[in-house]
Swiss-Prot record:
Motif (Nuclear localization signal 1): 1057-1074
Chain positions covered by the region annotation N-domain: 1-78
Species whose genome carries this gene: Homo sapiens (Human)
Domains (record comment): Both nuclear localization signals 1 and 2 act as a monopartite signal which binds to the high affinity site on KPNA2/importin-alpha.
Location of the protein in the cell: Nucleus; Chromosome
Residues bearing PTM N6-acetyllysine: K8
Entry's disease: Xeroderma pigmentosum complementation group G: An autosomal recessive pigmentary skin disorder characterized by solar hypersensitivity of the skin, high predisposition for developing cancers on areas exposed to sunlight and, in some cases, neurological abnormalities. The skin develops marked freckling and other pigmentation abnormalities. Some XP-G patients present features of Cockayne syndrome, cachectic dwarfism, pigmentary retinopathy, ataxia, decreased nerve conduction velocities. The phenotype combining xeroderma pigmentosum and Cockayne syndrome traits is referred to as XP-CS complex. Cerebro-oculo-facio-skeletal syndrome 3: A disorder of prenatal onset characterized by microcephaly, congenital cataracts, facial dysmorphism, neurogenic arthrogryposis, growth failure and severe psychomotor retardation. COFS is considered to be part of the nucleotide-excision repair disorders spectrum that include also xeroderma pigmentosum, trichothiodystrophy and Cockayne syndrome.
Outcome recorded upon mutating A792V: In XP-G; mild form
Protein name from the UniProt record: DNA excision repair protein ERCC-5
Taxonomic placement: Eukaryota, Metazoa, Chordata, Craniata, Vertebrata
Region (Interaction with PCNA): 981-1009
Amino acid sequence: MGVQGLWKLLECSGRQVSPEALEGKILAVDISIWLNQALKGVRDRHGNSIENPHLLTLFHRLCKLLFFRIRPIFVFDGDAPLLKKQTLVKRRQRKDLASSDSRKTTEKLLKTFLKRQAIKTAFRSKRDEALPSLTQVRRENDLYVLPPLQEEEKHSSEEEDEKEWQERMNQKQALQEEFFHNPQAIDIESEDFSSLPPEVKHEILTDMKEFTKRRRTLFEAMPEESDDFSQYQLKGLLKKNYLNQHIEHVQKEMNQQHSGHIRRQYEDEGGFLKEVESRRVVSEDTSHYILIKGIQAKTVAEVDSESLPSSSKMHGMSFDVKSSPCEKLKTEKEPDATPPSPRTLLAMQAALLGSSSEEELESENRRQARGRNAPAAVDEGSISPRTLSAIKRALDDDEDVKVCAGDDVQTGGPGAEEMRINSSTENSDEGLKVRDGKGIPFTATLASSSVNSAEEHVASTNEGREPTDSVPKEQMSLVHVGTEAFPISDESMIKDRKDRLPLESAVVRHSDAPGLPNGRELTPASPTCTNSVSKNETHAEVLEQQNELCPYESKFDSSLLSSDDETKCKPNSASEVIGPVSLQETSSIVSVPSEAVDNVENVVSFNAKEHENFLETIQEQQTTESAGQDLISIPKAVEPMEIDSEESESDGSFIEVQSVISDEELQAEFPETSKPPSEQGEEELVGTREGEAPAESESLLRDNSERDDVDGEPQEAEKDAEDSLHEWQDINLEELETLESNLLAQQNSLKAQKQQQERIAATVTGQMFLESQELLRLFGIPYIQAPMEAEAQCAILDLTDQTSGTITDDSDIWLFGARHVYRNFFNKNKFVEYYQYVDFHNQLGLDRNKLINLAYLLGSDYTEGIPTVGCVTAMEILNEFPGHGLEPLLKFSEWWHEAQKNPKIRPNPHDTKVKKKLRTLQLTPGFPNPAVAEAYLKPVVDDSKGSFLWGKPDLDKIREFCQRYFGWNRTKTDESLFPVLKQLDAQQTQLRIDSFFRLAQQEKEDAKRIKSQRLNRAVTCMLRKEKEAAASEIEAVSVAMEKEFELLDKAKGKTQKRGITNTLEESSSLKRKRLSDSKGKNTCGGFLGETCLSESSDGSSSEDAESSSLMNVQRRTAAKEPKTSASDSQNSVKEAPVKNGGATTSSSSDSDDDGGKEKMVLVTARSVFGKKRRKLRRARGRKRKT
């Protein structure tokens, strides 16, 4: 955090520096503030936090530092000092409070979101009520609407497809290169080649064939002799034929992949196919044909010996090849109908195996004649008699097609009734018995269109038994198929039924059918089962739909309501419930849109699920023994059921239909039959044997009564939800719009509040430190762990000249003694803010002690500061109470306490405006705490001096790191790292022009002025006071020195009286002594510092000294001064130049009268040979001239 507001105070002293100018400098980095900035500031464009923001920030900043060739040293925080721990405890409390507030805000946000969703739902319902309903409007698909994707294609992506295609092309290219290099390298007879996919083999063989055509001469030389040319041609022809055979074999293999399953299915059904060929139709893009050769079917005996599932699969398929006129009309109107699947075509071929073309023509003529004469009747003649007999034999063996009927089918009595839906596989015959509102029973046999035509042909021969004119055209017409043509005599079928006691029940949901009339209800019919199933009493009935009926929607599920076939039935017997029927209103129901089958009749088809889930029939039975037999009871009146029918000639488009009963009705009619759903989502009805029926039924009834209480709670919740929905019905659209807009505004405000609270609650953990250190090691950058404060460690590195400055935004570093700081290094601006201690000390008059005093007033990590005190007020306080160290704060605290003791006394009129304002401040007890200043002045740091080493970034490990923490791929990581590595590898660097002289712009920036007038006034007054204080100190020091000198002069004044004669004698004796010493030596001249001078010069000098001393004595006696000062006690000897042999000497001697000591004599001389050299040069010049 640093000192609050200190950067604002120092910004006038900072200047902008280009990052390029910092190239090669060693800078310390306080990483702790980076981590805090990343946690609190790094957000996505929606304001939400991202994953690993500290590592992402560190990565980008490292790249920038290294790009400018700066050598950083990262410093991590150590243990916090005691004073800082107290501040951190308070911060932690604020963070915990923000975290709890964030959770509350999240709950409010969720509630607001739910309210908005409820408003949208109600708003949509209101708007839908206002607009006309478009549910019954039939919309045809647009011409350019694509078919829905398969599940595999939905989960696949373009990238995966592209990768697969790329791998395939790489393999192909490798093979082509190897083949082009050496055509004999590829052995098409090898196992490796045969293990390749057929498509790849086909491409390779095709390339080889083309290669042999065009480039054969490159590898096989032409024969030189003409006789061998024919052999050359034959060899090429044989090789070409050899390749063609392999290509045909591969094509057959590819064809087998697409059409081979037809052969397998047909063989599973008991048939035999000699050959199946499938090819694409050239004239159409999406069509293909299947040619089946050598079809042989099983005999009837073989069919009887086969098991039920296989026979039902074979004979339950469609047999009609030629469609009716109505179907032809439909195909003309719908050209986009789905073509028949291979399985359907296979069934057609099997059905028409024994039919002749003449019989087909006759049946076609009879069917067209009947279609023109009696449109309500059923068409006949679409299948030959031989085909019909085959159908009869097949239906004899079908165990799942089993319809119980009696003489009282048309009665529709009030007893228990039974509805059975028979189905074995996707194309098996299925039946649904329906009764309209008048109680007339209708039975619908649900099958494909070709089977309908077959059954209509049989039913037309039995019109006498059950007339079809009894039902009007608007309702469903009944066509009864004679049971003599479909005998069911196999007793093994009934025995197989005995083992199927647990039957799957159907969940029936109430839904309105817009296509049905209001008075019509779909209810089960009421056939009565006899003790034995007779051949002559079995009826198959076909449900036909008229032109007036609209297409329906069918909702289907995997569960169907069923009962057991073992018990024998007798009419007019009471029914009891043996198994509960649970209802699940929230079960997933799939709606399948469909189209009308044709304009005359629509056939509803039921589709079973992939030969696994057989659709059990819904059957009502009456019991003859009320004591031991328990049956399923179905109500007579059931709500209308939505039915949607779709005809598609392919067997994969059959529609499954689920009949649904409303929850409330079944709860009312069967209060004891509710049961929770099973794990499979289906409901199992447990059938009972005759001896065990009473005991097990009683236990089931007890369990159901206990579960009723549990099911009551969800019903109450549903009722409350319905009541809450009814409350919205009286609200108009304008109120809903207003409420929704208010909720939207509240939601946005809660989002912003939550984001702010998350920023406050974010904290730096030790794991973040470890991850950051790992990234630094990968970049090869040194880092150190500070003993306590990272800012103090950076400052000591700067003070000991181990670094050239510090990159940080924490202003605490100035208080620890830093001299150079770079701020806002990673802003988008082109320049970095550079601060020096010398600059703001000269401009603002702030030193380290004053900065610590500002921390007391403004607040920092070690102290809270004084409330409502900013940087300007703090500078005014320091101006009002000057002093050194803590003296200003002690004065301020003393003055404030005095002012608070007598608040009612009239303030001093001499007080300034600042002091009047300072009276309202609130100081904490113990202000100022000297421990704060001690912590700043004497921090715990590591002052050892060592060398730092920088390594080269490890590219591979950095890529792996970015993949693990950021999810980046190799390309994105390289985009950031390659410019950095390129810049680091540069060997030569060039100096910038601003390194030679200062720019004019920089000089203008250095001359920034303080914008605040109050601050400018306070700084000016403070600087003036400092100058005045410095001047007064200097003046006091000078006065003190003068007094000391006067005392010294008085003490030394008595010893300064000396005789003039003594002085003259001393000087003359000194000169004589020097002359006597020099006479004993043979001298011939000298330089500075030598004592050997000429005699003439010595004599002249002595005479000059004596004359000068005599003149001085005469002047002093003439002046008659009674006292001599220390300054006048020195005797000066004037220099007198003496010419002797062209050499001049000058000397000065000073004597100190106070101490009576001799001073060193300074002698300056020229070379004695100076004039002689000049004369010699002149003589030489004359000689040359002569």
